[in-house]
Amino acid sequence: MKIFQIQCSSFKESRWQKSKCDNCLKFHIDINNNSKTSNTDTDFDANTNINSNINSNINSNININNSGNNNKNSNNIEITENIDNKAKIINKHIKTITNSKPIPIPIPTPTPISIKEKEKEKEKEKEKEKEKEKEKEKEMKSTINLRSEDTTSNKSTIVFTECLEYKGHQWRPNICVTCFSPKNKHKNVLPETSTPLISQSSQTSTITPSSSSTSTSTSSISTHKTANNKTVITYISSTTTTTTTSSSSSSPPSSSIAGITNPTSRSSSPILKSVPPSAYSNVVIPINNINNSNSNSSSGGGNNNNKSISTPSSPIISRPITNKINNNNNNNQPQLHYNQPQSSSVSTTSSPIIRPVLRRQFQSFPSNPKISKAILEQCNIINNNSNSNNSNNKDPVILCKYTIESQPKSNISVLKPTLVEFINQPDSKDDESSVKSPPLPVESQPIFNSKQSATMDGITTHKSVSITISTSTSPSSTTTTTSTTTSIIAEEPSSPILPTASPSSSSSSIITTATASTIPMSPSLPSIPFHEFETMESSTTTTLLSENNGGGGGSSCNDNSRRNSLNILPLRLKSFSFSAPQSDSMIEQPEDDPFFDFEDLSDDDDSNDNDDEELKEINGEKIIQQNDLTPTTTITSTTTILQSPTLEKTLSTTTTTTIPSPSTNSRSICNTLMDSTDSINNTNTNTNTNTNTNTNTNTNTNTNTNTNANINNKVSTTTTTTTTKRRSLKMDQFKEKEDEWDQGVDLTSFLKRKPTLQRDFSYCNNKVMEISSVKEEAKRLHGGTGYIHQFAFEAFKDILEAKQTQINRAFCSQKIDAPDCEMLINEINTAKKLLEDLLELNSNSSGSGNNSNDNSGSSSPSSSKTNTLNQQSICIKSEI
């Protein structure tokens, strides 16, 4: 079947396919009206057909163009040549005549396939699939029948639909491992009451228990002081006996089942044999040997055969355990008696069904800690009048008994952690002469015996034993742990049993026990016994107190010494400033004083002296020249204490002494007249100011005034204490780092504006501003006073040198360019020239001033020396 193509008026090359028209999306007809390619052909076929006809088409196109003038009524052919660089394909396009019509393309009629044939083919495919499934089911049934004949006699019809056998996942037991489908969709899952697929009838075992026991004993002692300066001794001894019973297997011929474990219980391994819990339900433990250490302790006619036992429930055991007391004194070791169900041997014919074990059922990691409280069970108060050597120390001794639940050491990984909490503390305000016992708990009331008491030197000791029995079972062994705890707390005065220091000083005593173990005691009460040591044999309380009474020469140590050694002492900085009496020569040359502009630090001018002389001549003897009465000596002591890097305390003391001039001695008349007007000649003022600039301001001022009838001197002392919060000095431009820019502004404000500033312009601009500020300050000083002091000139010069070093560093680190560096150095040089010019003006003015002063009879060198002597240097020293 041949498909005709439609001709279009103009050919437009497609972007993606060079041989296709973009208007009609088809391959066009050549000059000979032969179709090059069909619409179904690929671009490769079209290109090959076009390439084969290139030469013939070019020749025919040339002939048509030459004869185009003669045949005007014929078809006008427009040839467009598009040459591709890679394929070099030339596509010819024919322009149709305007009166011509497009050639219609006949639509082919496809030969339809009958629907019935398609349905038949589908049915055949389905039948083939069903046959394959049936073959697979037959194979699966054959394998299952073979297994069922070999393993079990009770055959059950099992049909498998998905996998051969169901295997539960370890973490998700309801999902099969092989097909990952739920358990409900499997038909091969056996019920729980039926026998397993793989039986172990041939492997039978009989458990014969074999026991082994270990015992450990620990004791601890601790003391603390109450509010009434009473010493409380806590003595806790713990004896732990662990009995482990393991099973050895044998294979008797009989296959009787005495006990079968619960199939619903999950086990981690199918090989281990499980033991019914009824076999270990009753545990009998003798108590006589456990309490042998306590039999010799009571000396007051007590009955030692009556022992008390308390069995609090263990948090590990889920089944109840019945405890019995065996008073047989012939048994030296703990014994275990088992109640055998129906037969003497316990055997299992098959292992339980393999079940996955969930993570939450493992006990390898301990759960949340369980708080076992130390319950106060008995408390007795004994008078201490017989042993008291001092009349002041007659405090009673309080004996308290606590019961603490202890955990065995063998199953630390299985048992829960235990925290001890002291409750029901004895009241220190009880009457000294009476003996009080608080109400006992319901569980521990039958534990105590009133006859278990002994008196020695006015002290009564009480003993009781608390036994905790815990049992943990496993498929192969059973561990029974018996923990015996004896706890005694005795409160006694600090003297004469325990030598302690005075109540005002905090000290810790040392107690020496029978095992030569030295324990430093802490004055504070801990929540858990903090000093714990193991002993060869548990010593009794009576022996402990007697040894402490006789040889308790304890030493004391000061806790504050170690604490103070760790503290960092504050840094003290002291500065002193001294001002000598001023002479008349200083007034003649005020230009040498750098603080001439300040009125409070300068004396009167010569014009004022002339006015005083005129007033003296007018008023006679009633007016005294002011310069003769104002020579003063001022000593300023400033102490700065840096208590912390952010806290600063300043203590300032100023002492001012006013001494009359010697010229006033010749004017005794004037002095006698002024005595009536002067009421206070000696004044001492102490001002203490505490200021905290952080949040609040507290000011405390204390002023002390003393009046003495002293005519010749006036002394005033002022002390000021100021506590301020230390801040930065904001002088970052003088301590520039190599990796940071020196912007010459406040660091905080610069960091806020840093992203918006340009790199080079900001640096150069700030440096120019700093140099110009030095120029302006120098001009201001010279314009106001007419001179610049030499110290100010040196300070300005040092600042300019520092700026020059900073600019050199910036140039070396490539922060600024060479022209910028030259520009900044030129600015510094202009500032230096300005300072030198101002200094020359100062020298000229000082030379003219010296000439005038020489004519008046005064010497400038002497005045300069007195000026340097009057302004003393500042001494700074640190004290730690």
UniProtKB/Swiss-Prot annotation:
The keyword Coiled coil applies. Residues 257-271, 333-342, 865-880 have a biased composition (Polar residues). Residues 101-149, 191-224, 240-273, 294-350, 425-446, 470-508, 536-561, 580-613, 682-713, 844-880 are annotated as: Disordered. It comes from the Eukaryota. Disulfide bonds: none annotated. Signal peptide: none annotated. Residues 193-223, 240-256, 294-332, 536-548, 844-864 have a biased composition (Low complexity). Residues 113-147 form a coiled coil. The keyword Nucleotidyltransferase does not apply. Keywords: Coiled coil. Residues 589-613 have a biased composition (Acidic residues). This is Uncharacterized protein DDB_G0281025. It comes from Dictyostelium discoideum.
